[in-house]
């Protein structure tokens, strides 16, 4: 605990924190070729590689992910949620923040049902997360 005199001399410093999705907080001014700080909920990008990865220790699967080059020039790994996908190299996708706990280095999710990404077929529950339309009665 600091003394009163120490607090009078220097105030308490607010704790600094690091963002968990840095690619969403970076923009590029292509005319001036400068990096700018923008806060975006999503970013668009082009898939450079679509592959599978095995998860960390207690889990076992082949999780699908894509390496995406974003409009701000960064390359990130993004998880492809849901069963089955139509993504391949040069597909245009929209990513959002949100890590996958058992995949190291994957801090983003691809949004299903937008741009070149198709929605998950035959999805009845949690449809909005997978871009699925409401089924006809």
From Swiss-Prot:
CDD domains: Ribosomal_S12 (cd03368). The modification 3-methylthioaspartic acid is found at residue 102. GO terms for cellular component: small ribosomal subunit. InterPro entries: NA-bd_OB-fold, Ribosomal_uS12, Ribosomal_uS12_bac. Coiled coil: none annotated. GO terms for molecular function: rRNA binding; structural constituent of ribosome; tRNA binding. Part of the 30S ribosomal subunit. Contacts proteins S8 and S17. May interact with IF1 in the 30S initiation complex. With S4 and S5 plays an important role in translational accuracy. Interacts with and stabilizes bases of the 16S rRNA that are involved in tRNA selection in the A site and with the mRNA backbone. Located at the interface of the 30S and 50S subunits, it traverses the body of the 30S subunit contacting proteins on the other side and probably holding the rRNA structure together. The combined cluster of proteins S8, S12 and S17 appears to hold together the shoulder and platform of the 30S subunit. This is Small ribosomal subunit protein uS12. The gene is rpsL.
